[in-house]
Amino acid sequence: MTTAKSMEKIVALAKSRGFIFPGSEIYGGLANTWDYGPLGVELKNNVKKAWWKKFIQQSPYNVGLDSAILMNPTTWEASGHIGGFSDPLMDCKKCRARFRADKLIEDHFAKDGEDTIVDGWSNEQMASFIDEKAIVCPECDAKEFTDIRQFNLMFKTHQGVNEDTSTEIFLRPETAQGIFVNFKNVQRTARKKIPFGIGQIGKSFRNEITPGNYTFRTREFEQMELEFFCKPGDDLEWFDYWSNFCKKWLLDLSMKETSIRLRAHTEEELSHYSNATTDIEFKFPFGWGELWGIADRTDFDLKQHTEHSGVQLIYQDPVTNEKYVPYCIEPSLGADRVTLAFLVDAYEEEQIDEKDSRIVLKLHPALAPFKAAVLPLTKKLKEQSLELFEKLSDKFMIDYDDAGSIGKRYRRHDEIGTPYCITYDFDTLEDNCVTVRDRDTMEQQRVAIDELEVFLEEKIKF
């Protein structure tokens, strides 16, 4: 039997067990910043490794890249970020609190159990709706707001010692543009033929008006993006391919199918350059939220950078000699969001019997921070247990834990998602076998020490 999960419980567990801490906590923190602790950094790194393995390492089409965070500012003129990367901002006239107009409207619908997206609404449409429905300020319940205005989301800074418009640069708001400007370099040096993709993992920055919901929406975040280039006319077929591939990646990592949905964008929501966009959304305790945006960006980006740079970003077919600007399919995934989703999805509270219950993170073993924990039955077996730890930790992330009773150690490792607990007992001295406990079933079996590496390799396969 399991009980309902809440963000409060998950946030509390994440802090108490060392997954996620508030940023700069000893100085009172900094709003909406989070630090990944010892277990959190392992979990997030495992998520990134799993993405890289399937999207880059095991793909015959794709190669990797690590582009700079700081780019020539003309990049952002070409991409449209300087002119059009903004959110609709409004202030409460009474308490001066600041809000995104579209989110106020979406929250209004959510209270009535409706799921409505207002992307594509004009400022006038949003203002009219807020007036008509008498939507109030969430902070003070006042009904008077300023006019809606657009607020650019890019963080601005300066390069060098002078601070004027000539030295103005930006922290990148997405990793994608670093891929587009390197299209020619990568295609030539990797000797890639269409279709092929370029993927990268990296930090991006957006000066969000209303960040929130823990690590779901932050101003500093990490993306895992693939730009997949194909021949015009083949784009919708590849769009379907990558949409299904992304969903399968989540399910293969043990995310529950009931926890996700694919939502196609309406015509009103679609960007002007997009042929199609589908979001893979996850059901968080606070509602459905986007994990993955999969977009058919057509040839918009390469054409824009060709126009602004003067460099022809085209492809010439080596067989037919046909020249064209490739279309691009972009699966863009937030590393922080999907890490949070795996944490939420894995969290369970189980009532084992009338007197006993437990919290358990049923993470896929490939994602679990520790693949196993070595537990000596008593501290008298510490020396031999540490030898086993050293042997296994050469290949796996292993914890060594000798504090408290075996039962308490089991529960501790259930809470942090360790799939296997390996107990070194006095029988081990005689038969060279250990007791391996399965996190999910709590069943135990004896396994020879010489077979442990193969056992773990088989269990954590992805």
UniProtKB/Swiss-Prot annotation:
InterPro entries: aa-tRNA-synt_IIb (IPR002314), aa-tRNA-synth_II (IPR006195), aa-tRNA-synth_II/BPL/LPL (IPR045864), Anticodon-bd (IPR004154), Anticodon-bd_dom_sf (IPR036621), Gly-tRNA_synthase/POLG2 (IPR027031), Gly_tRNA_ligase_bac (IPR022961), GlyRS-like_core (IPR033731)
Residues annotated as binding substrate: 100, 174, 221-225, 330-334
Main subcellular location of this protein, as a coarse class: cytoplasm
Catalyzed reaction equations: tRNA(Gly) + glycine + ATP = glycyl-tRNA(Gly) + AMP + diphosphate
Keywords assigned: Aminoacyl-tRNA synthetase, ATP-binding, Cytoplasm, Ligase, Nucleotide-binding, Protein biosynthesis
GO biological process: one example: glycyl-tRNA aminoacylation
Binding sites annotated in the UniProt record for ATP: 206-208, 216-221, 290-291, 334-337
Name of one Pfam family that matches: HGTP_anticodon
Subcellular location: Cytoplasm
One Gene Ontology term of the molecular function aspect: catalytic activity, acting on a protein
Any single Gene Ontology cellular-component annotation: cytoplasm
EC code: 6.1.1.14
Family label: Belongs to the class-II aminoacyl-tRNA synthetase family.
Function: Catalyzes the attachment of glycine to tRNA(Gly).
Subunit architecture: Homodimer.
Name of the molecule in the record: Glycine--tRNA ligase
Provenance organism: Alkaliphilus metalliredigens (strain QYMF)
